[in-house]
Amino acid sequence: MASETDYGTYQNVTEDKKYLGQEGLYLPMGGETCPPDGVSPADCSKAQEEMRNLRWSYLNSDYYKGVNDRWIAQGCMDKIKREMGYRFVLTSGGYTTNVTPGHLLKVVLRVKNEGYAAPFNPRAVELVLRNVSDQTTYVLPLDVDPRKWKPDMESTIEIEAGLPTDMPIGDYDIYLNLPDPMETLRDNPDYSIQLANEGVWEAETGYNSLLMRINVTSDEKTDIYNGDLVFTKK
């Protein structure tokens, strides 16, 4: 975007960009702008197309201000900031509404990545049930890798798990938690991934509300669960 070869970044522009676009699906990719040399300054449309194709996760905000300020003036810088890196949106979901302790809970979630890239570091994923009355919380770690939630793609998470046999009767809200996998950061909500949907983020916990509520009931509404995936009390 700064010159024919982006100041020597590329030799074969078409092939090199194709290669970097694939690498950027798995590795950190980004950079900075430069004073245009022999080409017209990149406008918003061109800039966003290039960053998405190259899977950018970061942009130097200090250089080159002549180009960065142009994007601000054209009104796309906020959108660039939102879509830089990954941007996960919950598009739909379904779940078992009434479940008996010790029985099967089914949840299906669909998440779209509207960002330029995917996460390049490992990330934990948990399904959380929290009692509406006393806030008692149950957690289920999921065998899901958000690094595989690629840009412009929708991913499906299918969960079949059991409730503890001693789980108290009552209503429970369902949350999705994507904490940092490091033990020292796992319970720090500042390091949890926030979904882009409005009205779902819980800042004090780092949980994302799925806007779903199940009723744990003594009535046998679902099949008995005999598998290994069982929620545990936090």
Q: What does each model-found stretch correspond to?
A:
Residues 43-98:
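Catalytic cores of secreted or luminal carbohydrate-active enzymes
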Residues 78-234:
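Extracellular/luminal regions of secreted and cell-surface proteins that mediate adhesion/ECM remodeling
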